[in-house]
Amino acid sequence: MDSALQRVIFFGNEFPSDDLKDLFRRLYQHSKDRRFRLLSAFLEESTTVLKDEIAKLPWPLKELVPPFNSVLDLADVDFRQGPLGAAMESSMLTILELGMFIGHYQAEDVEWDLIPERTLLAGLSIGILAAAAVALSSSLADVSKNGAEAVRVSFRLGIYVADISSKLETPQSDGTLKSWAHVVTEMTQASVQDELNQFNTDTHSPELTKVFISAADKTSVSVSGPPSRVKAAFQHSPILRYSKSLPLPVYDGLCHASHLYTRSDIDAIINCAESVIKPDRSVRLALLSSQTGKPFVAKAASELFLEIGTELLTGTIYLDNVTAGIIEHFKLQSEAATKCRIDSFRTSLVLRGIHSAVEAHFAEEQQQFIRCDLVCWVHKDFGPRQPRSHASSKLAIVGMACRLPGGANDLDLFWKLLEDGRDTLTTVPVDRFDLNTHYDPTGKTENATQTPYGNFIDRPGYFDAGFFNMSPREAEQTDPMQRLALVTAYEAMEMAGVVPGRTPSTHPSRIGTFYGQASDDWRELNASQNISTYAVPGGERAFANGRINYFFKFSGPSFNLDTACSSGLAAVQAACSALWAGEIDTAIAGGLNVITDPDNYCGLGNAHFLSKTGQCKVWDKDADGYCRADGIGSVVIKRLEDAEADNDNILAVVLGACTNHSAEAISITHPHAGAQKANYRQVLHQAGVNPIDVSYIELHGTGTQAGDAVESESVSDIFAPVTPRRRPDQRLHLGAVKSNIGHGEAAAGIASLLKALLVYQKNMIPMHIGIKSEINPTIPKDLERRNVGLAMQNTPWPRVEGKKRLAVVNSFGAHGGNTTLLLEDAPEMVKAQNPEDRITHSVLLSAKSKKSLQANMESLLSYLDQHPETNLADLAYTTSSRRMHHNMRFGTAVSCIPALQKALRSQLDNTNFASEVRPIPNEAPSVVLAFTGQGAYYSGMGRELFSEFPYFRSQVQQLDQLAQRLGFPSVVPVIDGSIEDSSKSTILTQLSVVILEIALARFWSLLGVSISAVIGHSLGEYAALAVAGVISAADAIYLVGRRARLVEERCTLGSHSMLSVRASEDAIQQMLASGPDTAAIEYEVSCCNTNQDTVIGGLKDEINDIRKALEAKSIKCTLLDVPYAFHTAQMDPILDDLEAFAAHVPFNAPSIPVLSPLLATAIFDVKSLNANYLRRAARETVDFAAAIEAAQDMGLVDSKTVWIDVGPHPICAGLVRGMIPSVSVVSSCRRNEDSIATICKSLVTLHLAGLTPCWAEFFKPRECEYSLLHLPKYRWNETNYWIPYIGTWTLDKAHLKHGTKPMTPFSLSMSRPSALRTSLIHQITAETIESTTATLHTISDMQHPDFLEAIQGHTMNKCGVATSSIWSDMAFTVGEYLYRLLMPNVKDVHMNLTDVEVLHAQVASKTRGSIQPLVLQAHLDLSTNSMCLSWFNADGETGECAAESFATATVRFEDPAAWKKEWARLAHLVRGRIEALEQRAVEGKASRLSKPLAYALFKNVVDYADRYRGMDSVVLDELEAMAEVTLVPERHGTWHTPPHWIDSVSHLAGLVMNGSDASNTRDYFFVTPGCDSFRLLNKLEPGAQYRSYVRMFPLLEDPNMHGGDVYILQGEEIVGMVGMIRFRRVPRLLMDRFFSPPTTTSVVGPAPPVVSAATKTHGITQSVPEISAPSPSIVVSDSTANNTLTDKLPVPVPRLASSSESSTPKESPIATPPESESAEPLGNTVSQCLRLMARETGLEVEALTGDASFVQLGVDSLMSLVLSEKFRAELGVEIKSSLFLECPTIGEMTAWIEEYC
């Protein structure tokens, strides 16, 4: 630091005025550079801190924060709104300022130069926290660490302030931001304070919610308070009303409020700083107080944070003092320093004032003042960026599952197989293929296998289709690999306790799937025998992962990898890489292989891969190749820190994973020792591990001569070198699972990994059984001397205390790839003692079928019988919080294992179990909170909740602090039970009840309960109004306390009483009136609880007389234990004051309906909620019964509604049941019962009723004490879905000779005589011209030669389809024509064609000589400079126009100068992207397409005529492309702008969507329904050259739609643009439906051959062809031209059918139309439809019950299209496919058919 320099660093409380997203983006980019290591460290630490703090939030708040990998990701989120606004804004400001501060130093590459004597830190509000991080630092590295803790404090401060403030005034339910502070200028602090004092006095404002001064200086005063009260204060005071004032951007609550916060609040926020910053750490730099203008006196960190917290929460800001403090600093150093510098983050109004004052003070002195902006550096370019580092997290494998040969259908069976040394070798099962015909050991039979051996999984076709929402037909067509990938993924997640969304690492958007697969046997063989609707999604590899992501709603990446034999382990390595890269937080990975195709056997055998003698003989001298094997395996992987935070069971830790390639091998299939060794070194370096420390290696070990020799060499050289030698205690054990279960090919690597994980679990290396004779002589001879060898017997592998065992897993691919994983032991988890203080525990089981639920219950019962030591708390945690819950449910709350066993046996022994079990409703029932009154009070209510749950405790404490600040006593001793009896105090009694109820309501929300309505009984109505947002929590406490105090002061204790009577009001009146002694007794009805429960009140003696009289008539009466008669005349003395107090309380519209016992109705708005309402509620009858009846009448509640009694004891529960006997009511607390047990029982009831409680929050307080149990896996309700390979056609195809017959091209008429106006506008039928408007109607004939030629230049499905450029030319033609009529002197007309929407495609009829008219209607209005257009079809004979248009658009007449200005700003960006594409093409990273190739790709959907083919070359990179365009010189007609020119410059977007490999063009085609705008700066020129550029992207609002902007350039300038052109994805199955000529029916393909009788396999009908080759199929299309292309199109999920025909065999070889009359009477239409649905879906008719939903049956949008076509074709029943959405269940569908068909 310059010795002559004094320095002040100012940390403001406002963001810089720059684009914040850009600042954070630049900060992030710089953090990747090696130059900015400390900046990166700070951002990473801040990310960790924020994730840690967010994880501690209650889930409703946690859900508001999107998943983020870095705090900078949050810069794109609008963090200034919502409940987290204050926290996010505070923390992000702290991050920005400290990030800029650190980056400034590193950008300038200067050392820490802050000299304490010459450096002063200053700041305002949150800025002081950032400054504190610097004040405590002696180096820049310290700032990085301390800064993260400043971020933590900032976040906590924001959370705390927002929470407290929300209790003072309820935030707006619509998200509207209201300021909590206004600044007043030109008034003194004293005069403003006088006005505020007057307002607070006049309005009886409570101290807690008073309006106050939070900041002041000479020129301004800041006034703060709840927004409504601040507004009221300015309206109340004429002086303030007419003062100069502005609202400040303070939207989240109050700081600087000494009346609101105390030391306990400050401690709650700042005590976190001690977690990293030592409390005794010295303060290094002076930090100025914004209140006193003097440096804080603190000497240590803890004192400093305490002072800062006190100032932020309770201190007033005095800017003049800040300025004076800065001047004083400069004055003290003025003699030694001649330069004064103020560093800041941009400037602000406050900072400019400080600058001016300081410079003015030193104006006469010879000092140089410098201003330094700490933000400027971020905009600099520091040259090429050097990557900082790779991620260094360890990874944890937390779950696994398998289906492996030899019956190893779970991990226990797999281990048993290994432990017993079993060999799973068999011959090929008959369900795969017939060895009698396909096996020839001589090799003479073409396409036959020379080996009969393999290793196969049991029951590969068995699958629970219903669980995965698949129809039997879809399940049958789906590859067993895909099915078992789903199953094992679920089982692995079940073992891992993964519940998507439970923790940040398991958020669905952060979970990805990675599977290895190297064959397509099912698709190529079994399913190809009869290709059906689900052939593609059931057989294509990508759908294996896609199904997992789609079913579980994971939106992370899904990759299906093929690296031959190493695919499975390579998929795991890819998953690890994604985790290390931060792309995901959880990965599900595995390998898949199910063998069915004899072709692959033949191919591998002919290539000499396979052994002809049997199993893989790993390291045996007779090794002669590998033996094929099935295998399915899945693992779940997380980063280690996430797994530990999630309380997972860690099976092993991944230290490193690498893949390379044997590029130098002698042949592509030959292994290479050098490459293998290089891969080992890489993975060891990655982990920093000594190879000598590795003690177990699971070899690739295939049992081939070359493979075994090379791997043994590479392993021994690296892991057991000659020198340094391994010590005797460093034995390297080797194993090879292929000797047991064969070579699983794509699943081989995952099988090896599963074995290694089991070795870790079992602490034993199983025996190697691969050496059948003697060891292979090619293996190094000195292995024993090197202390390495195969484990020839089961060998213990104990874990040594203080050390971690290291293991390596190898998997090599036949193509040359090598993958290696390095593993170590899981961390030793020491669980905290679990004292099981909770006396009741929830145990939950669920399934998707009754059979599975029963089996799950039986397996749990069996587990408990075998493990009687099972900890009930762990079992509850596992089954409740760590399981996905399904619609068939069992649940119970028990206190011991025997009770659970009894409950399970009771259910299982019930013979009516199957009929009594019902699935939960598809829609969760509504929930009503019922708040009890004072009568439920007792000491210790909620004691256990207060002790156990920090969230509940914090809510009670915060509400209690509000009560104390309002002058009322603390209620905590009542709630936690530390005082025994305080019922004599009405204030304490009523406040404790209301505070308890508000806290309970918030606790229920934390537990995942979504509230539909509230109702309060008497005192409980205050809590209900607070929870509904009508009044704030602070106001509820204030009013209840005031009301109670008035009662104590104005009402006589014990003079009145209340009596509960078991009779109606009328019955009581009649009985009393009939008695001579009771007729004159006066009483009042206080409460009508039910129709037979009434509470009356009055004078004590008279109530006693009434009780005696009624009891004499056998009427049950109960005298209530209350000191006053509420809701009677005894309350009259308090009413006026109560209303006066309530008059100053703001009332809001309820956020949820309020059921009013006063008004006997439901309240939805604020009109009837006011001070008078509370007055009446205190005095008038509580008509609880009428309120419930009204809610029933209004449909707000019904018999399915769940009611939660919120209060100390369930009083309202009985009242609700009295009104709705069948209703479900649960309690929050119960007298003489543990409140946690009560909540637990209630949660179980809610769970069984169909709600989804947040079990994670229920177990969260003690989660670290619980263990995740390894319980029996889900029991599947399986059916065998297997398509057997029939015949010998894989052999026969070697002898088949195929011929082809070319299709005859369609001939076009090219004549185009025209005497009409233009080629597209043929006749004007109406024209109206007025002064400023014009209307025009035209008619055109699409069969006219010019028009027809334009259409035929753009053909789809061999049909001419009108391109959008046709409508563009027509619009421009009519637009210029009308505009010039109204503005004849205009020189040029520039038009913007906007809002183009084409609802129906226009397809040219193939009937020549006919008329195909269309009408164009246009209306131009000069007042808006726009013209509306509509296109209509018309009748060919009458010319009558259709009622609805098929297309609309608007032409806007605009100034092209604005276009030029807009495009000038964009031109360099577009050119940059074009240059980047060109460079990528040069590098081979993008595809350069010639004109022929580009239009050949286009023919995938569209065939363009030559005139339309203007693109000379294209560079295509996924969804981004550019094209060089030359327009044809001929206009070919009369146009405004020829359509073929428009298409040439714009149809690049269509090529991207229909030709890019980024689009699924095999299953779909893409059509454009329109665009937002189309502009051309100048008219297109014949023969001119242009360039087009586009980047398409998926639209968030519609997953089936893409959009993008097409830029048209001439030279370097943009001369045109198609804005937001949209393309909709449409299944190719529907090509005929949407693009067929209006008058034709086409039959494609020959008739199918005659087939033999159908065979049936497990209920699925199969066609058996008479010849062994697959049969061709027939497609019949009968579609009209006008087919919807826009949002009304029911686009199916990605599935494609080769034919819409059923797989059911037909007796006739030709297609015949449906008969005119059904074979059955019309009354049987429903049964016919049901049978057809059963046939097409593969379900039994009995399964189509009335309550079965189409989603559950697997009827998706594609199947609904197929069914609607079948209904029409076979039954003559016209049903739209959308009806399956409108009638979502079988019952609704059949009712519709009965009604309308």
Curated annotation (Swiss-Prot):
GO terms for molecular function: 3-oxoacyl-[acyl-carrier-protein] synthase activity; fatty acid synthase activity; phosphopantetheine binding. Binds 1 phosphopantetheine covalently. InterPro entries: Ac_transferase_dom_sf, ACP-like_sf, Acyl_transferase_dom, Acyl_Trfase/lysoPLipase, Ketoacyl_synth_AS, Ketoacyl_synth_C, Ketoacyl_synth_N, PKS_Beta-ketoAc_synthase_dom. Residues 392-825 form the Ketosynthase family 3 (KS3) domain. Its cofactor is pantetheine 4'-phosphate. Residues 1663-1686 have a biased composition (Polar residues). Its EC number is 2.3.1.-. SMART domains: PKS_AT, PKS_KS, PKS_PP. Residues 1318-1637 are annotated as: Product template (PT) domain. Non-reducing polyketide synthase; part of the gene cluster that mediates the biosynthesis of neosartoricin B, a prenylated anthracenone that probably exhibits T-cell antiproliferative activity, suggestive of a physiological role as an immunosuppressive agent. The non-reducing polyketide synthase nscA probably synthesizes and cyclizes the decaketide backbone. The hydrolase nscB then mediates the product release through hydrolysis followed by spontaneous decarboxylation. The prenyltransferase nscD catalyzes the addition of the dimethylallyl group to the aromatic C5. This is Non-reducing polyketide synthase nscA. It comes from Arthroderma gypseum (strain ATCC MYA-4604 / CBS 118893).
